[in-house]
Amino acid sequence: MSEKLYPVLPEAKKNTLIDNETYLEWYEESMSDPDGFWAKHGRRIDWFKPFTKVKNTDFNGDVTIKWYEDGVTNVSYNCIDRHLKSRGDKVAIIWEGDNPYIDKKITYRELYENVCRMANVLKKHGVKKGDRVTIYLPMIPEAAYAMLACARIGAVHSVVFAGFSPEALAGRIVDCESTFVITADEGVRGGKPVALKENTDTAIDIAAKQYVMVNKVLVVRRTGGKVSWGRGRDLWYHQEVASVEPHCEPEPMNAEDPLFILYTSGSTGKPKGVLHTTGGYLVYASMTHQYVFDYHDGEIYWCTADVGWVTGHSYIVYGPLANGATTLMFEGVPNFPDQGRFWEVVDKHHVNIFYTAPTALRALMGAGDEFVTRSSRSTLRLLGSVGEPINPEAWEWYYNVVGDQKCPIVDTWWQTENGGILITPLPGATDLKPGSATRPFFGVKPVLVDNEGNVQEGVADGNLCISDSWPGQMRTVYGDHKRFIETYFSTYKGMYFSGDGCRRDEDGYYWITGRVDDVLNISGHRLGTAEIESALVSHHSVSEAAVVGYPHPIKGQGIYCYVTLMTGADAQDPDELRKELVQHVRKEIGPIATPDKIQFAPGLPKTRSGKIMRRILRKIAEDEFGALGDTSTLADPGVVDDLIENRQNKK
């Protein structure tokens, strides 16, 4: 753990919405009087019919979660219509294309017309309240229009990341029995086309074999690339929207009506359809967006995620737009045309708040500082991190090099299931420790539990649970409430189990140590892989590291490290560097963490969202590379061949 403490910056304190005193006061109120607290903050969104009930939740038995259950509202209305009077001409979405010379600005009034037209197209083709619509689009404005159009008419959207394979798309279409798909001819990423329409056609054929028939496909023309056409089924978006009205009344929605399904992989079985509902989700997404990012009217906010992930739902679309913010959507990748792209976009659009993932930061850090320092980044005020624990070395680089020591970093912990950020610093209230997500957001009760279910008090290590509900929490697994209870509420009775390990320090700060299934047991000692990875990455030659366990004849599990080197570091003698890294880890953590195998690799197997696929790394480490399972979601499947070829553990 990093011992360094970074006090709240004077500049952040000066203009903040929440200082430390306010944080402590509000947090105490949210614990002692959740009904009163959430009633007050529930009014941050507009209700067609105000709620009289606030919290009705039970983590035992059949697990019911209801918030604002008698209130009536509409998410699309809250994200668009209510802003038209005061900020109709304000930019709602800045779209930055994959090509650095292409961008577009969409005002709230233009957003209204685009969303209403798309909503009317859906209605024209028979989509009704409660129907599931699958959205398989690249990061273009139409992705946001599609989500908001579904919300407007009460259809439930299921966004599938445009990097997923036809098989993955088909599985998601089948699971929620979706009959309407919105896609594009092609996507563009890093200058290369992605065959979305072709993938959609394949997925529809696969779904049909499982008796789910897609009736209509709305196709956005992104590249003008050639596509095959299903007569009577396929529709051009640009033709359809031209023939409908730019006005559509928002459907009155009960607070507990479904808003969206988003599939997330579990440790077992097929992906789970995480179901989020209307009222509580929007209250929580908008409130966390405002206070975690200390958002002030007029600022330019950029979350680099994709709408195919929950971060894109909550912090590109719903949270920012509910707050009347200007949100930036980026179609491209961090390293195209080169590794300076993020910072050039920051300068070009005068970005004030920047929210990205540690995996991107580590890759950019490995490319060298000059890609960062050639930009001014003078408009940046706040930096954020999401998706996985950020190792202290990447945190320090982000703070010192990207932020020039003038931007607080909000290292946020949350999950698809949570709807919004649960543990996080607040920039004007929280002293920072590199690598720590620090303190819980309002209304969030973290509990550390040992493997026997005993609650750990004070300084402790344990399994991270949340002991009471918050408005943004998922309500069920779509079509499988039993799986919902088994996955999240059966391990520790009466608590939501996150699946993550965590440490609480003497200041009450929380340190996420990685998935509990990523914990190694070395000679009877528990070690989080994140700790070993962090130690490796703190070495000046290492850009990125992933650590897994493998069967060891003496210790039970051995430590197998995959290491990607900094540019230029591969000139060293590999055996010498291995010895150096072993000593470095021993020094950082202790002899118990001595790596057994270190394999140098040009890249790690990652999904297109940047998550490292540890399952594949485990199999290679165990020499079971015949059983790698599905590798179709990998960004670069060629990486796997290199890993197998050069594995350190050949039998």
Swiss-Prot record:
Its cofactor is Mg(2+). The modification N6-acetyllysine is found at K611. ATP binds at G387, E388, P389, D411, T412, W413, W414, Q415, T416, D500, R515, R526. One of its GO terms (cellular component) is cytosol. It comes from the Bacteria. One of its GO terms (molecular function) is AMP binding. Acetylated. Deacetylation by the SIR2-homolog deacetylase activates the enzyme. One of its GO terms (biological process) is acetyl-CoA biosynthetic process from acetate. Keywords: Acetylation, ATP-binding, Ligase, Magnesium, Metal-binding, Nucleotide-binding. This is Acetyl-coenzyme A synthetase. It comes from Brucella suis (strain ATCC 23445 / NCTC 10510). The gene is acsA.
